[in-house]
Amino acid sequence: RLQACASMDHFWGERKWLDILGITKRDYKAFLQEQRPLSDTSITSLADYLDVSADEIQQGTVDFRAVSTQKGDGDKVLPEPYSIAAFGRLRTTITSFDYIEERLGWRVRADTLRHFRINEAVLSDYMAPTNMRVITDLALYMQTKHNMSDSQLFHMGMHSSVGNRNTLIGAVLSTARDITEAYAIYIDELAKFFENNLRYTITLLREDRCTLEAVSYRYVAEALGVRHLGNKQVCAIRAGMLASVPHYLDQPQASVTEPLCVHRGDSVCRYEIKFPHVASL
């Protein structure tokens, strides 16, 4: 994993990696197959290069993301296509990559970051501005390249409550008196604070359910050269995020459906949200 984090898992990178370790390719293969250990000299040399301690390498406590940030390929700022018309934040992208690693492993996370030319350093700031292209491209890529189903994308969205629990979102929502108030805060205050890509309108809010409609702001869509922001995959992620709101109150997830969607030809994306005590009946 350290080799991949340092972006040395390609031909020329591997040669440099072997030079750092001071061993042959054959010896390295034997190490990977657990047929021989790395020498203290190799470990010390690697630790010096990665700016970590030899003990961290031997004990498996290296901060892999820190290594990727310092040594990995990719720009340490968002690539230009994801920086124009940046009316959103990176928080959803960050929690989505965390879900990818949890479900598919660190290799898929690393390969996906490399595909988009994004360095781990970019994913250290939840408040960093971005546009909707990055999550749109990521969601489509995960479905086409890694066969993620709509259900898995939904769970990717739900995973946001895990990553956000110790952030401003978690702090604010955990103080809500009940689920109804939590949704009102999430949609009317937090969503509008964190992004200005879509107009969110609550058309119904009762003690047992909520109806939400979302429409792209025209000026943002035009700036990105699209009619509607996002895609059906992003809608699945958003549905999962909406379902996770009760988690901030330590309650089960809500039931969320999307009967109307602009990506299916409708004029709005409409989400019908049934609160957990109703969904469980």
Where are these regions (language model features)?
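A short, Lys/Arg-rich alpha-helix, primarily the initiator
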Residues: 1-16, 20, 95
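Residues in the helix-turn-helix
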Residues: 16, 27, 56
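Recognition helix of helix-turn-helix/homeodomain-like DNA-binding domains
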Residues: 22-38
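Short terminal or interdomain "cap/linker" segment that borders an active site or interface and mediates
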Residues: 39, 59, 198-239, 249-281
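DNA major-groove recognition helix of helix-turn-helix/homeodomain DNA-binding modules
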Residues: 41-57
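Short amphipathic recognition helices of helix-turn-helix/homeodomain-type DNA-binding modules
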Residues: 54-83, 157
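Amphipathic interaction/junction segments at domain boundaries or subunit interfaces
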Residues: 124-234, 260
